Amino acid sequence: MKSAGAIQKNTEKRASHDVLFSLCENAADKLILLVLLGSVLLFILWPIACIALRSLRGADGGVSFAMFGTVLRQYGESLRNSVFVGVFTAVLSTILSLSAALVCATARGWKKTLCMIIMLVAMVSPPFISSLAYIQLYGRRGWITYRLLHLSLNPYNRWGVILMQSISFVPLNAMFLSGILEKLDEGSLRSARDLGASGGVILRDIVLPLIRPATLVCLLLSFVRSLADFGTPIIIGGRFSTLAADIYLQVVGYSDLEKSSAMNMFLLIPSIIFFFIYRALMRRSDRLTDASRTAQTELGLLLPHCGAIGWGMIALSTVFFVMIVLQYGCVFLSGFLKSAKGVYSFTLQYWDQLWRIGSSTMLRSVEYALIVSIAGTVFAMLFAYYMDRRRIIGRSLFDCLATLPYMLPGTCFGIGYILAFNHAPLKLTGTALIVLANMLFKQLPTSTKICTASLALLPEVQERSARDLGAGRLAVLRDVVFPALRPAFLSCFVYNFTSSMTTAGSIIFLIDAKRQLAVFKLFDAVYQGDYALASLIASVITVIVLLVEGLAFLITRKGENRRVSRT
């Protein structure tokens, strides 16, 4: 038997070991928090500040506003064009989005499934695909305008830009509005029906007022996205130019960072103003729809019973869905068709061309997307936990900063990274790291929101109970929080992968010529008029993303079935 002295010695040794482990765990916890907050300041706030500082730099190195006057004189028309297109695009896109969302929320059976599939394909497709399909369908030699209607129209104008931007913004807006509609209180709709209200009255007096804040959010987001879009005006704008397109040409053609920074300020300032309006509207929307129903139930409303408003929305959404089907059908077919004297035949020559010049870029795109998906998801989970549960000082400020990239134009965020990380001690330009960091923090707002929503389902009492039983902060994070965030991990992974495969605006200035990505091969092919190759690249990107999303769906469904079988 051990002596009392030996037992006491072992106890003291174990106690000192526990104290040392606790100190190390607390230090690691503080280090994680410091890295999270420092990364947000470094990779979000600092690039934005660099744009503002560079735009105010005068010829003598002092502070000067002269560059803003130069921009207004030289690019005043482009600025007016941007506002013109933004307003029309925002209104048209919001009307189409609201119509499509109501159709999706009220449809039944296979109709609802079909609408959701079309929306999903449109959401995960790469940029520039709308412009590509627009040229092939409605161009001077378009399938519809020329071959079917025998018309030779000039599609390169402002109205083409407005139409394509509006259609490309609808899927994301409509899915957002569908989520809001699914949260409406069924009791309010049922009470109105019991009191004799018609479908049209319920839609006009209950549904539309409840989703008005969310509708205004779509309006703001569409306007900001239109301001930031450079690809559509460059490809189908013709002589019509916008400020975002001029920024792209200014950086790529002249490398004038001072002027491009000043030009970006005209996009950055309204975006930041709209950002705070967006946050206020989202809080109001949450108050109107929070005490509602589960997302799996159907909206108890039928649009055909809603009078002229309902039928009008059905007509608009039908036009939208038909255009989307035509658009993607055209793109998928064009990659395997060859025209000879007006006769089309099946061919694989573009596939061989893609394999020769684009296989490495496609693999690199997948590699980057996987890295950003894993790293970005872990970062978002940690950031959401520390902001939501730890209640640190300045939490509101850091949460606001982390959400800011959601509203920033891609060109602003990209040029900000060039200015911020183009010199010692943190020179990242020309490396893959700057591209990965830009992708990660551009997608951080949505990833954090997904994780925060999952955290809301985890009672804080479980964390407190674990702490009361002696678990350290990191042990609680590892054994309690992370397992509860497993569904959020998969959702964030899919979102980050999809966004990384299809992003263009924020990283177009950061890509090294030796490290091209597939989405920029697509842009080059469209810009150079190689539409068949562009169609094939777009199809491959879309199929890769859909495969990843399908795999994630199967994993989620298998996990749900396993939990049901256990119960």
Range-by-range predicted roles:
Residues A245-P270:
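Helix-loop-helix hairpin linking two adjacent transmembrane segments in secondary transporters
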Residues F230-Y254, S339-V343, A504-Y531, S565-T567:
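Glycine-rich helix-loop "coupling/hinge" segments at transmembrane-helix boundaries
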Residues A28-A59, V71-E182, L210-G231, A262-A280, ...:
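Membrane-water interface segments at the C-terminal ends of transmembrane alpha-helices
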Residues M1-V35, A280-T318, L551-T567:
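Transmembrane alpha-helical segments of polytopic membrane transport and secretion proteins
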Residues S198, D286-L303, A340-L354:
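Juxtamembrane inter-helical linkers in multi-pass membrane proteins
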Residues L195-A197, P209, L469-A471, P483:
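Glycine/proline-centered hinge or cleavage motifs at structural transition points of membrane proteins
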Residues V63-L72, F346-W355:
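A short amphipathic helical element positioned immediately N-terminal to and/or at the very start
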